[in-house]
Curated annotation (Swiss-Prot):
Monomer. Coiled coil: none annotated. One of its GO terms (cellular component) is cytoplasm. GO terms for biological process: queuosine biosynthetic process; tRNA wobble guanine modification. Keywords: Cytoplasm, Queuosine biosynthesis, S-adenosyl-L-methionine, Transferase. GO terms for molecular function: S-adenosylmethionine:tRNA ribosyltransferase-isomerase activity. It comes from Rickettsia bellii (strain OSU 85-389). The keyword ATP-binding does not apply. Its EC number is 2.4.99.17. The keyword Lipid biosynthesis does not apply. This is S-adenosylmethionine:tRNA ribosyltransferase-isomerase.
Amino acid sequence: MKLSDFDFDLPLELIAQNPISKRDESNLLIASTQQYVKTKFYNIIDYLKEGDLLVFNNSKVIKAKLSLDKNITINLNQRLKDNRRATNDDAGRLKSIDYWSAFAKPARKLKVGDEFYFDNHKIIITEKLEMGEIKIKFELANISVFEFLDKYGEMPLPLYIKRPERQKSDDERYQTVYSNIQGSVAAPTAGLHFTNDIINKLKAKGVQVAFVTLHVGAGTFMPVKTENINEHKMHTEYCSITPETAAIINKAKKEKRRIIAVGTTSLRTLESSGINGNVNSGDFETDIFITPGFKFQIVDMLLTNFHFPKSTLFMLVCAFAGFKEMHELYKYAIEEQMRFFSYGDATLLYKKV
């Protein structure tokens, strides 16, 4: 299929610039086969049933945006594998070393070997790659990289959120209430609508919950640039499924209960690990690219926000719920003035069979 097959006209005013005042008061579009139902998110309880299994991504967004100086910013992308170690500096003080990939703006102002200081901590440019990507080395004085980012970094809101400045509330609202494993540089946004109260009410109804981890990388915002979508190269992201979670999911599959992925990240994690209809536990990386024709093994329903035209995520929902059906659904959502992208509204999709 061609990239242009996944295009549609999106009015810019529908790109949500701020979260709605209460998480669960965003709109929810139920895309059943019979009709569309537009409701408030807190009513999702009415559309799930006893025995359903909700699978969340528990990755936590880190403050991945750093100002190296007044003219250069970087957005961390991904922690490089097997990179962490502790050593001592010349004075015998403990120093932690950490390696990451990042995107620099403007990258042309950087060269390999450049050093930037944050009090007694240091960032070194170790490699320059294509399209503004760089590799960096953290040399930190007796703190972890996450403690460093909490002190010196900013929440990495997407570029399509165009505000004069960040708001303190973003530190809370661009984070799910259940996130607890640090590593994402963008939010798994379908989960932003959930409150602890809604999760507790779903459990009381008999809906089961489980958690996987996918650390969202900055590559999630990279546009597809090839007209032949099969030529697009996906970014890799770290995933993890515990043996306990795999057992819960496989039991639900065996009992033919519905598995509902909360967000495309949860879906990509589950489908990446699926073999012969079962989920395997473990830590792994995925570059899975889901397009129409993909054979889903694990997920029955998908809760997700509304996505960009010509994006890999719009291709994913077309693969899951139908190409024609998703173009029609998005046309309806635009007519209904629903809010798009990270701080926008949600839709509950059923797998097309």
